[in-house]
């Protein structure tokens, strides 16, 4: 029971983080090339990956794995 709750929390965090990043960028509060934007996208995608694979929903799991990789590359480029 506790494991399922924790996984659901990861999933909801992921949803809120990705939607927040998109909304903040769309309303010009943050730019897409900022660290906070990429962190929200990357950590949000990780949360969705966790809940997706737990529920055996592989399409969103694969999509968000790719999303995580893109965010990680963008973050690395900021520091190179």
Task: Name each region found by the language model.
Residues 59-73:
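Juxtamembrane/interfacial segments around transmembrane helices
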Residues 72-80:
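Juxtamembrane boundary at the C-terminal end of a transmembrane helix
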Residues 10, 17, 24, 40-43, ...:
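Hydrophobic residues within membrane-embedded alpha-helical segments of Major Facilitator Superfamily
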Residues 27-32, 54-58, 80:
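Membrane-interface helix caps and helix-loop-helix hairpins in membrane proteins
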Residues 1-21, 29:
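Alpha-helical transmembrane segments and their cytosolic membrane-interface
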Residues 47-63:
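Membrane-helix boundary connector in multi-pass membrane proteins
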Residues 29-42:
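Structural signature of hydrophobic alpha-helical transmembrane segments
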């Amino acid at each position: 029971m506790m494991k399922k709750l924790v996984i659901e929390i990861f999933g909801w965090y992921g949803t809120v983080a990705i939607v927040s990043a998109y909304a903040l960028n769309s309303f010009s509060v943050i730019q897409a090339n900022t660290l906070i934007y990429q962190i929200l996208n990357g950590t949000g995608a990780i949360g969705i990956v966790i809940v997706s694979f737990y529920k055996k929903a592989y399409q969103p799991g694969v999509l968000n794995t790719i999303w995580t990789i893109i965010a990680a590359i963008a973050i690395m480029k900021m520091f190179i």
